[in-house]
Amino acid sequence: MKISLKVEEAMRVNHGTGGGWAAAPLHLLRKSSLPLLLLSSIFFSPLPARGADDAVVPNEALVLDGLPAVPKALAERATAYMEFRTASFQAWNPLRPEMLVTTRFGDVPQLHRVKAPGAARTQLTFYSERILGARYRPKTADIVFSKDVGGGEWFQLYLREDRTGKVTLLTDGRSRNQGGAFSRDGTWMAYTSTKRTGKNGDIWVMNPSDPAKTDRMVVEGSGENLFVTDWSPDAKTLLVVEGISVNESRQWLVDVASGAKTRFSPESKELVSWGGGRFSPDGKAVYTTTDLDSEFKRLVAVDVATKKMDVLTPGLAWDVQGFALSEDGTKLAWTVNEAGAETLHAMDVRTRKEIPLPKVPYGTIGGLGWSPEARNLGFTLTSAKSPADAWAVDTQTGVLSRWTESETGGLDANAFAEPEIVSWKSFDGKTITGLLYRPPASFAGPRPVIVNIHGGPEGQTQAGFLGRNNFFLNELGVAILYPNVRGSTGYGKTFVKLDNGVLREDSVKDVGALLDWIAAQPSLDKSRVMVTGGSYGGYMTLAAMTHYNDRFRCALDVVGISNWVTFLEHTESYRRDLRRVEYGDERDPKMRAFLERISPLASASKITKPMFIVQGKNDPRVPYTEAEQMVGAIKKNGGPVWYLLAKDEGHGFSKKKNQDFLFLATLKFVEDNLLK
């Protein structure tokens, strides 16, 4: 599955030769390919160690409270579902016909190069922490990549020299740094950093060849909401997006020499979202996405001098999800999110005619990037039948090629279930949709259901690879349903606003309506339903349990918000104001009272069914204290609760050893509480 992510999604644009780099944090631009239920446990590694009593032994970074032993037999049954990996397209090499990808052979994703479709992957980095994204420095084969430590999201930027393999830290090693854009000749790189105050995201410019002498601040920001998306061809101007909320963002032109800002996006009485942009080679136009005068995001070309906007994708009833402009400016590629799956399109900019492309398998497409000669289009494709892999299409011959073929643990991926789009009416007559994965027909009778709610809240569950979750379908006969409740993206900007402010709990009522729908389905067992979700989906899980405790068997909350006030007061300062725009300002007495009232912590006494709460100690978004106060409240009320804390993780688990144990513990939780 795939989850869109907040303000950063508005900046999703890729430069001509790279699919893995943009103005927002690198890892956030490629949406998660698995639901947070199991936190993307998707790559090969041996099973966790087993004790003498045949129980799986957690590693030293995990703290367990209330969890029973996970038996060896359960781990052995699940082995094949853990032994697979994914790969993501990052960029085309400017000098050689090869791809840069991220994949994982050990514990965390690293950089690899691939020289041809199906060729061997050559590993380039060997860190104990994850690589989040990368791109080539123009005109060279040197790579700039992003990395953090322990999931803390204090991203640092590094330069890897192609000739020597030497890696140089470009940033200060302490602040949060988000990769931006290179000038056309590769001399200059602009990026956003909190190094000045630790909170405000300022725009900086450096020459990566000599960062110590050239690094300087260009724009003093306020909060972490400025993202550089491109340089003008003459390297005198930066195109910058200011993200305010998922519904509102602005574009600015910034003079590199003086730092002077000129608004580029037009003033509007309504809230308008503008995505990242890309200058045409002559600097006379900017290609971008916007929902100005539209319910959905469209691909447009804006004249720099006159601000006249030319809509390139008229008549769409879906969002343009991402796009890429070739280096020479002759070709555009874009994806359209059609009911949770993406279609791929390309255009000859000179004629404005679409380029015929082969049909891409049903799923999600991300990280678009043109090869230097503007012939091959690289991207990451995820489908129900395949993990994320790097693909390319030759726009001259129409040949679609798969550059990586990630392993699936020896399982027959063609047998994995495809999603079915389902819909139901909510309390106010609004139609809510979701994706339902059914177990094989060999499982007789009404089936148990896991309801998995995405994060965001401005996100969407899209068709993709279920990964480990296929175990629930194929081995346990459990159906999985992913609702896109109100507030989700992908269904128009009006739908996104339906849960704002005091309407927050209307999205929880959508879950109640879903329970009514499940009860009316002969193939589903209304008496055996579990709810789960991560981040905002974790809040939804806790809220659903306080409202519908009697209708759920159990629940799994992953890095979820338990109290809106304490969350807003303790989320990292660089993101606090952005979250207040979405959820409300807790400093206002009336809003504070409302947020306290709807917080799951205030109604924890209503939760009597088994709960499993999972958290990363280094989470900068949802502090670990949100989990611990909820665990404490449930215990105080005599409720059954399991608690798993990872001391070396942040907002979700990224290390394979931790993912392994979480998956196995989740299986134990499901068998003990949903299936019995």
Where are these regions (language model features)?
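Beta-strand-rich domains and repeat architectures in extracellular enzymes and scaffolds
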Residues: 73-112, 135
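Active-site-proximal cap/loop segments of hydrolase catalytic domains
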Residues: 475, 482-676
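Multi-bladed beta-propeller domains
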Residues: 53-86, 114-130, 160-176, 196-198, ...
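Beta-strand C-termini and the immediately following turn/loop, strongest in propeller blades
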Residues: 89, 94, 99-106, 115, ...
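Short amphipathic alpha-helix adjacent to the substrate-entry channel of hydrolases
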Residues: 464-483
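The serine-hydrolase catalytic nucleophile loop
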Residues: 457-470, 625-626
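Short beta-strand element of the alpha/beta-hydrolase
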Residues: 445-455
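N-terminal cap/lid segment of alpha/beta-hydrolase-fold proteins
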Residues: 404-443
